[in-house]
Amino acid sequence: DQTDTDLEEGAMKVILVNGSPHPYGCTYTALMEMANTLNAEGIETEIFQIGTEPLAGCIACQNCAKTGRCVFDDRVNEFLDIAGSADGFVFGTPVHYASAAGALVSFMDRAFYTDLRSGRQLFYLKPAACVVSARRAGTTATFDQINKYFTISQMPVISSRYWNMVHGHTPEDVKKDLEGLQTMRILARNMAWFLKCKEAGIKAGVPFPEREEITFTNFIR
């Protein structure tokens, strides 16, 4: 689901993941507000729909450590195949029982764990943001939940002037949430600014942070 762009070849790219079972619902409406703003800033965008097919949770089989791919060959592997070409990510979700949609949780659990165990480093130092859509409540708990994937993966988290949420029962409702849509536009501009700063830093020869071998310490030994 590619957004229409008129951008230069080689432009930086942000993948926006729609974690809703509704491909063109409230979450999509918020993501498109961001996508259009990113395009205006010269950033290419792609909407990735996780779809409505059942997505299994991680079964800790460690197949990803051996093959670099999840043992369940579905939308997770399709996403990981294109993630390397992205410069930034946005993950959008509706609120279900004051938390993220179950399918998106399974999707992100497996995507991020596969990346960790395989050593592919598809997300390392790439900016990320989450977008949350609700009819009424549960948004901040869901916002915190999704951000935890980024902050355990060395991904700079992009913020806006308010927590990244929109409200509405239908896409038409979301379009009336003027503050929510403004929050999406500011979020997109902040991400575009960060991407341009990162690109300028790399071109200027600013080195990436020194890497350390990861140390694991179990609480109970």
Residue ranges and their predicted role:
Residues 71-162:
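Helix-loop-strand module that forms the ligand-binding subsite of alpha/beta enzymes
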Residues 44-53:
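A short beta-strand-loop structural module common to alpha/beta enzyme folds
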Residues 53-80, 216-220:
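Cysteine-cluster motifs in flexible loop/terminal segments that predominantly coordinate metals
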Residues 156-221:
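Glycine-rich phosphate/pyrophosphate-binding loop and the adjoining helix
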Residues 13-41:
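N-terminal beta1-alpha1 ligand-phosphate binding loop
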Residues 1-11:
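Short, Lys/Arg-enriched N-terminal segments with co-localized hydrophobic residues
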